[in-house]
Amino acid sequence: MKCFIGTCMYLTVAIVCFACNTMQQKEATTLPVSVNIAKVNFTLNSGIANVNKLPFTGTIFMLYPNTTDTAEVRNYLNGYEDGEWRKYYTGNNLREKRTFTNGQKTGSYLVWWPSGKQQQVYNFKQNVYEGTCREWCENGILIKEMNYSKGYETGTQKAWWDNGKIKSNYIIKDGRRYGLLGTKNCINVSDSIFK
């Protein structure tokens, strides 16, 4: 019985120590840090963002030259792209917004024209296109509407010229294209993952 109680106490102490150690490590790597890229030694090494040769956790921002206007804001966790990224036109008008999770593109990738009108809405899941992706020309006319599943074209695919006339309109069924392709080089879509 003493052996059992001793073992239970040892396990309890070990669990508490491990939990505290894990919490301390997590706190140390997720402290909010925001730095100007021009003020630090920032490098990308094999896809890992480093500041002063260590994997970076925090926010990196860039300014337009000779201004205080933000050009870009990126977030990293342990050197990997993580969280929201934003790019701006001069004058702080939003140009792009996207999300990463542990180095992979996730969620919506949104792009705007300098006028503030929507230019693109692409959706990602685990680093590849997922769902409906759309593009508009600067005057607001829809010029592309594509559907994806796990990075592959699927279902209805449509594209228009800038004047609104149809460019291509086809369906993907069983990995093959049917309809108006609007291309000269037909490629088997079952071999094409879009990222």
Task: Describe each model-derived feature in a short phrase.
Residues 19-195:
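Glycine/tyrosine- and acidic-biased, solvent-exposed loop/turn segments at the edges of beta-strands
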Residues 1-29:
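Bacterial Sec-dependent N-terminal signal peptides
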